[in-house]
Amino acid sequence: ESPAKATGNDRFDAEPNKNDWYETIKLNYGVNYFDNRSKHFDPIPDTWVKMTDILRYWAQKGIDGFRCDMAEMVPVEFWNYALSRLKADYPHLIFIAEVYNPAEYRNYLHQGKFDYLYDKVGLYDTLRSVVCGQSSAFAITSCWQAIDDIRSHMLNFLENHDEQRIASDFFATNPFKALPALVVSTCLSNNPFMVYAGQ
């Protein structure tokens, strides 16, 4: 088979570097990455059925929600397929997506059926830049205006497993500098705020 393995972050050769996700593999969701990412969803790829069954297994166990890491690296059509079916049987389920491309936010909310998206490249990055003295607080205005129509579906946070701890020397040297950002992040709107405690 060529390639013998593709990493989760789309590396298609046998020599991934230290920044590649060499410990992951790319599942076949019906996208041909060697043919301009052409989509082949008819018939439904077997991966869609199997992954939906895995989510259903955990829903049957009483899980109330899923955080979908790097959801945008999986076709939005799959999420529509899976989440539509799961929410029909388990309407209480909450799905949170990690999507870093703001141009795709509405697509993953409306077509993908996600309840919430991480607001990482918007509010988090802006607040961090303000806290660290790299941006003016005026930057916050354009940040929230860009997602005003979907703000209730954005999950705010000040730290998670991918980001440095606020209390670390690498963030702003002093955790108390982040208190204004905490107030903004929790009070800016009625959307949820994630308190990081291992998620």
Predicted regions, residues:
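Alpha-amylase-like alpha-glycosidases and glucanotransferases acting on alpha-linked glucans and related
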Residues: 1-65, 71, 77, 84-197
